[in-house]
Amino acid sequence: MNGSNPIIEFKDVSFQYQSDAAFTLNRVSFSIPAGQWTSIVGHNGSGKSTIAKLMVGIEEPSEGQILFQNLPVDSQNKREVRKHIGIVFQNPDNQFVGSIVKFDVAFGLENQLVPYKEMVSKVNQVLTEVDMINKADDEPHSLSGGQKQRVAIAGVLALNPDVLILDEATTMLDPHGKSSLLNLVNEVKVNNHVTIISITHDLDEAMHADQIIVLNKGTVFKQGTPQDIFKCEEALISVGLDLPFPLKMNRLLGFDSTYVTYEGLIKKL
């Protein structure tokens, strides 16, 4: 992808939760380009959430190898790897530990014994970046779903990660909240030079990515740019995925079957 060096590589990775169980992942190989947005897409049971656990060393591969910046992700190195990767989950409530927003964002910095003045400055910086500085003294649980995700992202950004993983982070948001959050994530990628990995079943979300990896039954089904992936509409439908809204409307209205974004569909109309 555009000559970018891979920050994460999966090399013939297989995984099973028990030695006598079926493989959740089977000989999976792919690379995540540094500084770009990769979306890992699949229906429930395709293995996408297992990949997120493997990336940060929560689980270890049964076979094959995972590299982070050429460093093996294994029991010996996983603590070092985790310093560089932040995760935002579907339900951010589980990540909140403080009574107000700014304390939650500061939590990771406190654990790193960051000096107080530096910590306050960093918290204000990242809350401003995610447009939540006006909620700094609010209780996290009083916020909307989209606002909670912004706070969770701020907490990750405070630690200056190289990689931000979004594990079904937009699933519980309404269309406006989802669109707003995805625009923010793209800004984070550009402004902070952070590699984005979104784990999702939602092809509308995947349209924002630079690279899409489609999983099916624990294997890589397709991999490429959005333009490459969405040329294969029938194949995507065959593995249980819903087409993005612009492509659905494109088919419904009888337009040509070329890849189309929201903006492109509006121009056709």
From Swiss-Prot:
Q: Which Pfam families match?
A: ABC_tran (PF00005)
Decide whether keyword Membrane is in the record: yes
Keyword annotations: ATP-binding, Cell membrane, Membrane, Nucleotide-binding, Translocase, Transport
Q: Does the keyword Acetylation apply?
A: no
One GO CC term on file: ATP-binding cassette (ABC) transporter complex
Q: How does it sit in the membrane?
A: Peripheral membrane protein
Q: Which InterPro entries match?
A: AAA+_ATPase, ABC_transporter-like_ATP-bd, ABC_transporter-like_CS, ABC_transpr_CbiO/EcfA_su, ECF_ABC_transporter_ATP-bd, EcfA_1, P-loop_NTPase
Q: What is its main location?
A: membrane
Location in the cell: Cell membrane
Sequence positions that bind ATP: G42, H43, N44, G45, S46, G47, K48, S49
Q: EC number(s) of the enzyme?
A: 7.-.-.-
Per UniProt, the enzyme's principal EC class comes to: translocase
MF terms in GO: ATP binding; ATP hydrolysis activity; ATPase-coupled transmembrane transporter activity
Domain ABC transporter: residue ranges: 8-242
Q: How does it assemble?
A: Forms a stable energy-coupling factor (ECF) transporter complex composed of 2 membrane-embedded substrate-binding proteins (S component), 2 ATP-binding proteins (A component) and 2 transmembrane proteins (T component).
Describe the family membership recorded for this protein in Swiss-Prot or TrEMBL. Belongs to the ABC transporter superfamily. Energy-coupling factor EcfA family.
Role: ATP-binding (A) component of a common energy-coupling factor (ECF) ABC-transporter complex. Unlike classic ABC transporters this ECF transporter provides the energy necessary to transport a number of different substrates.
Q: What is this protein called?
A: Energy-coupling factor transporter ATP-binding protein EcfA1
Q: What is the lineage of its organism?
A: Bacteria, Bacillati, Bacillota, Bacilli, Bacillales
Identify the coding gene: ecfA1
